[in-house]
Amino acid sequence: MPRAIVFDAYGTLFDVHSVLARCEAFWPGKGAQLSQLWRAKQLEYSWQRSLMGRYAPFSQVTEDALLFSCEFLALKIDGKEKQALMDEYRRLALYPDVSAAMKKFKGVKRAILTNGSPDMIDPLVAQSGLAFDAVLSVDELKIYKPAPQVYQLAVDRLATPKEQIGFVSSNCWDALGAKSFGFTVYWINRTGAPVDRTGFQPDRIVKSLDEVLL
């Protein structure tokens, strides 16, 4: 049994597409398209910045991705709309299965390991009502997941060998990055997607957090 369980935040505990309603309110008929592209560019920019060695906080990456997405989709966005959407990212909804499922993980260290910068992740955790032993941000290292040194941060801060850490993510690229590093990995595959072909496999594939059994 793992001595610690580490969770990704965005897309795993918090639904990144809970911004869709506000997107749709601003641009009727375009909300879903904007939400999807915004998330895709957010990830792309984080990886690109890591490869270039040009770190910027996740809040900046998220804003840049939003502005690109609006430009690409020919959606005019003003300062108030931009701020409203950025504020939405600081109050994303928990997935419905999260609160009850977290009660199962008593007796082990619990942590979040996230690409989110403190100005984005701290408000989310505070409003969630969830308790963690640590909330770890890549902002300390200035590089994004799936860089191995990010997963090492969890080992160091939790003072737990990687072989005794369970890692939970709904993002396959993150799950496989954690597996490559040496964690026991639970991939929450909510959409029934195939495993990415990178030479690694999650230890267990589940459909929701409440299926994760240590």
Regions found by a protein language model. Give the residues of each.
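Asp-based, Mg2+/Mn2+-dependent phosphohydrolase catalytic module
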Residues: 1-5, 99, 103, 113, ...
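Active-site neighborhood of HAD-like aspartate-dependent phosphohydrolases
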Residues: 1-43
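Alpha-helical elements of Rossmann-like donor-binding domains used by nucleotide-donor carbohydrate transfer enzymes
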Residues: 21-22, 37, 64-68, 84, ...
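Short helix-capping segments at alpha-helix termini
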Residues: 27-31, 72-77, 128-131, 159-160
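A metal-dependent, Asp-based hydrolase signature
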Residues: 32, 40, 46-83
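Structured helix-beta-strand junction loops
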Residues: 41, 107-108, 131
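Short, acidic loop-to-helix structural element flanking the phosphoryl-transfer center
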Residues: 55, 59-60, 77-112, 116-118, ...
